[in-house]
Swiss-Prot record:
Species lineage: Eukaryota, Viridiplantae, Streptophyta, Embryophyta, Tracheophyta
Tissues expressed in: Expressed in roots, stems, flowers and siliques.
Descriptive protein name: RNA-binding protein BRN2
Keyword Ribonucleoprotein part of the UniProt annotation: yes
Underlying gene: BRN2
Subcellular locations according to the entry: Cytoplasm
């Protein structure tokens, strides 16, 4: 049993693009085995139709066998029915896994390479160690290191990750497998998936489903499975009290005109600060959403045009320079955002109150960890005010949100001038 497990860990997975859709797994296996040892081939198919997507994974017993396949086929052989040569590369994360490469974060900025060597060498032989530094050669508080074997890397992770605090730091070390940007994107999307259920056509979403890809493309060669996630409510027709409660916005900014909660509403939906509480366990854990939002129920599938380019569809952070500002009084500052939230989650949370032009969660450049604050921009002041009235003080994942208008430079300058006696004297004269 142990030998079988070790054999599986040594296997190497390759991604192959530009595969003719008419070819079968047996045909591909025969082709690749002419040049190297290949254990199996798995054609990647559409999730719903099961039609081939023109790419596949293949598994080799060792890295040497995998390199033979890459050297023999990558950009060198065009199969009948294909327009371009085969693209053969390591699947995402394989190189990092094979090299036993670790990422270490939350290091003191003044840590030396000798200190790190001394700590991590207790768990095995270090082949390579690289402290990440900025333009002024100052440490970013993180590093990459490689061990001689996987067992040594695992031992270091188990002993140090979240448990050891280095001298000069106030938080434990983060020790994990190094990953690629594509893997980080996939992890963000999976994190979103853990908060929500899959969208069902019979169950409309309160927030709609922000279009996003299920997993990122492998090596950029077309393996891209489309998918959406929505925040589901129970079927509307089964909620007998809903027609007495939910009233769409008619343009006057009031969503609860002349409506009241009836006795038929379950206790868990009783009013709280003039808003009903969250419906069951849907939506984000810990956030008490109102049943009636200022803009009423939003369709389950929002078109891409309703979200500005400032909100990425693949889960990556967008630089502040690309932020889309709303009109004066329509931009919000959000504090105490849950640490696991990113741009997409923030946008989805504030989408019910109006058209979101952009959403940004600020992260530490060195560690990639959220700073727990960000900004939301709406297309109108009314939407921003509705968001403040509803969300300020709400509990979200155990944190009490602080939602207020973002101060622009003009307001700050005016406030500073108003405090200046000379400026006040000129006004009075």
């Amino acid at each position: 049993m142990a030998e079988e497990t070790m054999e599986n860990e040594e296997r190497v997975k390759l991604f192959v693009g530009q595969v003719p859709k008419h070819m079968t797994e047996i045909q591909l296996l025969t082709l690749f085995r002419e040049f190297s040892i290949v254990n199996e081939v798995n054609i990647i198919k559409e999730k719903t139709t099961r039609a081939p997507r023109g790419c596949c994974f293949l598994t080799c017993p060792t890295r040497e066998d995998a390199d033979k396949v890459i050297n023999s086929f990558h950009n060198k052989k065009t199969l009948p029915g294909a327009s371009s040569p085969l693209q053969v590369k390591y699947a995402d994360g394989e190189l990092e896994r094979l090299e036993h490469k670790l990422f270490v974060g939350m290091l003191p900025k003044n840590v030396s390479e000798t200190e790190v060597q001394s700590l991590f060498s207790e768990y095995g032989t270090i082949k390579d160690l690289q402290i990440l530094r900025g333009s002024l050669q100052t440490s970013k508080g993180c590093l990459f290191l490689k061990y001689e074997s996987k067992e040594q890397a695992v031992a270091a992770m188990e002993a140090l990750n979240g448990r050891h605090i280095m001298e000069g730091a106030n938080v434990p070390l983060i020790v994990k497998w190094a990953d690629t940007e594509k893997e980080r994107q996939a992890r963000r999307l999976l994190k979103v998936q853990s908060h929500v259920s899959r969208l069902d056509p019979q169950n409309p979403s309160m927030f709609g489903a922000l279009p996003m890809s299920y997993v990122p493309p492998y090596n950029g060669y077309g393996y891209h499975v489309p998918g959406t996630y929505g925040y589901m409510l129970p079927p509307i027709q089964t909620q007998h009290a809903f027609h007495n409660v939910i009233s769409p916005n008619q343009g006057n900014g009031r969503a609860l005109q002349g409506t009241a909660l009836t006795e038929s509403v379950p206790p868990r939906l009783a009013p709280r600060r003039n808003f009903p509480t969250a419906l069951g366990n849907y939506g984000y854990h810990g956030l008490q959403y109102p049943m009636a939002f200022p803009r009423g129920m939003i369709p389950p599938r929002l078109p891409l045009t309703t979200v500005s380019p400032g909100i990425s569809n693949n889960g990556t952070s967008i630089p502040s320079s690309l932020q889309t500002e709303g009109p004066a009084g329509a931009n919000l500052f959000i504090y105490n955002i849950p640490r696991e939230f990113e741009d997409q989650e923030l946008a989805a949370t504030f989408q019910p109150f109006g058209k979101v032009l952009s959403a940004k969660v600020f992260v530490d450049k060195a560690t990639g960890i959220s700073k727990c604050f960000g900004f939301i921009s709406y297309d109108s002041q009314a939407a921003a005010q509705n968001a403040i009235n509803t969300m300020n003080g709400c509990q979200l994942s155990g944190k009490k949100l602080k939602v207020q208008l973002k101060r622009d430079n003009g307001q700050q300058q005016q406030q500073q001038q108003s405090k200046n006696p000379l400026f006040n004297g000129l006004l009075n004269s």
